[in-house]
Swiss-Prot record:
Protein name: Large ribosomal subunit protein P2
Keyword match Acyltransferase: no
Oligomeric and partner information: P1 and P2 exist as dimers at the large ribosomal subunit.
Transmembrane segments annotated in the record for this chain: none
Protein role: Plays an important role in the elongation step of protein synthesis.
CDD domains recorded: Ribosomal_P2
Lineage top rank: taxon: Eukaryota
PANTHER family linked: 60S ACIDIC RIBOSOMAL PROTEIN FAMILY MEMBER, LARGE RIBOSOMAL SUBUNIT PROTEIN P2
Protein species of origin: Dictyostelium discoideum
Length: 106
């Protein structure tokens, strides 16, 4: 993701190449993987950045919509399993040693 963000910043300046992406990443203290920078630049070279962003938004929206119902169904059994645990946790109160017939100040 950071490589993509650096590429997008470099493309805004009109200088989207591996050297620019590397310089951007190093400026914020990222340890740069040169092979990954080359791969990102090669994959995105010549593509419209706005079209890539629009395609990414549509993919993220479809994944989020599909994942939401799955999370809701898995939460119900977990809540049902947690309810019996509360009944078992009840502790017995220890009897106090206060009234054993040995009062010091009777």
């Amino acid at each position: 993701m950071k490589y993509l963000a650096a590429y997008l910043l470099a493309s805004l300046s009109g200088n989207a190449n591996a050297a620019s992406v590397t310089k951007i990443l190093q400026s914020v203290g990222v340890e740069v993987d040169a092979a990954r920078v080359e791969s990102v630049c090669k994959e995105l070279d010549g593509k419209d950045v706005q079209a890539l962003i629009a395609a990414g938004k549509s993919k993220v929206g479809s994944v989020a919509a599909a994942a939401a119902p799955a999370a809701a169904t898995s939460a119900a059994p977990a809540a049902a399993a947690a309810a019996p645990a509360k009944k078992v946790v009840e502790e017995k109160k220890e009897e106090s040693d206060d009234d054993m017939g040995m009062g010091l100040f009777d």
